[in-house]
Amino acid sequence: MKQHTYRIDGGFSFEAGGSVSTLQVGYHTSPYEYKKGMKVIWICHALTADSNAEDWWSALVGPGKLFDTDKYFIVCGNMLGSCYGSSGPSSIDPETGKPYYFSFPKVTVRDIVRALDAVREHIGIEHIDLLVGASIGGFQALEWSVMKPELFTRSVYIATTSRISPWVTAFEESQRMALEADQTFRACESLDGGRKGLECARTIALISYRCEDGYIRKQQEADADTLFADRAASYQRYQGKKLADRFDAYSYYY
């Protein structure tokens, strides 16, 4: 897929308050120019993914695959608040020359969808044949379907819902607490701030994504007589570090 950047000049106001003078949206498309009448598939990614769906969804996206980039014009836009090409807390504030950190306006799903829809209009797409979203991408797909139902022929929502439950809210707050417990997080001295908190937050999220049986099947100790079980623990540490190596705590917090 081909990478692009779209700038929204003239100001962008956020649903929960606040605005920025210029908004940037990163996105990927099939590697050719869109022409009217092409079949369009739009993919909304999960929280820590980027807009290159061919990379992280390689089993489904690409030439000759289910979401065939040769047959369909496929678009995936990077969500606002991310650190993968769209404006967010890690972006540079033009007034200070430093990252926004917590001065970046709070982002809602509707804000993300408005930015994606601006990209759609910029490309010149008038109709989307299939809209697909997973996790927070599913929230975006659902919101977009409600805001502009006439745009879509079919929509697919994966691992999502119309509103999060108290159970999910509790998991998310525990992750925020982990970030805030890292003293480097609020210091806002560099985008490496909150790294250890991010590692911990990711391990909390992993437990919500998986189940007890899964850990028993895949993270069982090789030696049942071991004094100190470590396989599942080392897996958690590995996954926490893996995310912190490619993502920043501020974008995760947002």
Per-region residue spans from a language model:
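Short glycine/proline- and acidic residue-enriched helix-loop micro-motifs
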Residues: 97-104, 185-191
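Alpha/beta-hydrolase-fold enzymes
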Residues: 151, 157-242
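Hydrophobic, aromatic-rich cap/lid helix
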Residues: 244-254
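Conserved acidic catalytic loop of the alpha/beta-hydrolase fold
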Residues: 97-103, 110-130
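Conserved hydrolase catalytic core segment
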Residues: 126-169
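A gly/proline- and charged-residue-enriched helix-loop-helix capping module
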Residues: 67-71, 83, 108-110, 117, ...
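Catalytic-loop region of hydrolases
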Residues: 1-40
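N-terminal cap/lid subdomain of alpha/beta-hydrolase-fold enzymes
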Residues: 28-94
